[in-house]
């Protein structure tokens, strides 16, 4: 649960901190930042600030983006909402952009931002070119699927799942083809 949640960008080469009222509003919780593969957009999750902790199960995060020019140290002036949750009655977290820049993998769950504790948490994929959801339901189970990451060439993902017992988390691998279709996931081998 975030009582305060803002985003800043640290340029370690120039030793400067980039921030904006767009990313540190008292009216919203901003979290889970990630850059587009070309570094020209910052994707993140944002939810309207509400009374916490008494209303924590009503916090729902949208997926947003902001243009950035890291060479000049300039952040855009307008936040774009990529996926709105008001029609989904869900919360979104962990946006990760594929190395090709075409796909955004993220987690959808009922509320909040710590999805591993939500049995309903599922992985979802959004095609940033066509601006449409891609069906990757083959990756999901009755238990939580949560944190995930792309391989460096963008044809594989690794993700956390509690599908075996619902009590502990294991890592699964799945192939993603050039159209964003997911193959059947398999348990990450633990021994040779």
Residue locations for each model-derived region?
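Residue-level detector of Asp-centered blade-edge/turn motifs that repeat once per structural unit
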Residues: 37-38, 99-100, 152-153
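Multi-bladed beta-propeller domains
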Residues: 8-29, 67-93, 125-144, 175-192
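Predominantly soluble domains enriched in secretory-pathway, periplasmic, or organellar proteins
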Residues: 98-99, 125
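C-terminal, well-structured subdomains that either form a transmembrane helix-short loop-helix hairpin
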Residues: 146-147, 154
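Short basic/hydrophobic patches in alpha-helices and adjacent helix-turn junctions
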Residues: 156-160, 174-177
């Amino acid at each position: 649960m975030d009582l305060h949640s803002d985003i800043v960008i640290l340029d370690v080469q120039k030793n400067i901190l980039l921030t904006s009222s767009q990313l540190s509003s008292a009216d919203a919780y901003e979290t889970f930042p990630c850059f587009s593969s070309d570094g020209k957009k910052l994707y993140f999750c944002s939810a309207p600030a509400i009374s916490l902790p008494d209303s924590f199960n009503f916090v729902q995060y949208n997926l947003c983006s902001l243009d950035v020019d890291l060479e000049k140290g300039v952040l855009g002036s307008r936040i774009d909402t990529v996926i709105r949750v008001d029609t989904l009655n869900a919360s979104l977290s962990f946006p990760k952009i594929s190395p090709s820049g075409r796909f955004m993998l993220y987690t959808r769950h009922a509320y909040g931002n710590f999805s591993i504790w939500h049995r309903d948490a599922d992985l979802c994929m959004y095609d940033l070119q066509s601006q449409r959801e891609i069906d990757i339901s083959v990756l999901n189970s009755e238990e939580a699927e949560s944190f995930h990451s792309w391989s460096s060439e963008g044809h594989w993902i690794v993700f956390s799942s509690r599908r075996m017992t619902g009590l502990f988390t294991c890592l699964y691998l799945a192939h993603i083809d050039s159209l964003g279709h997911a193959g059947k996931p398999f348990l990450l081998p633990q021994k040779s």
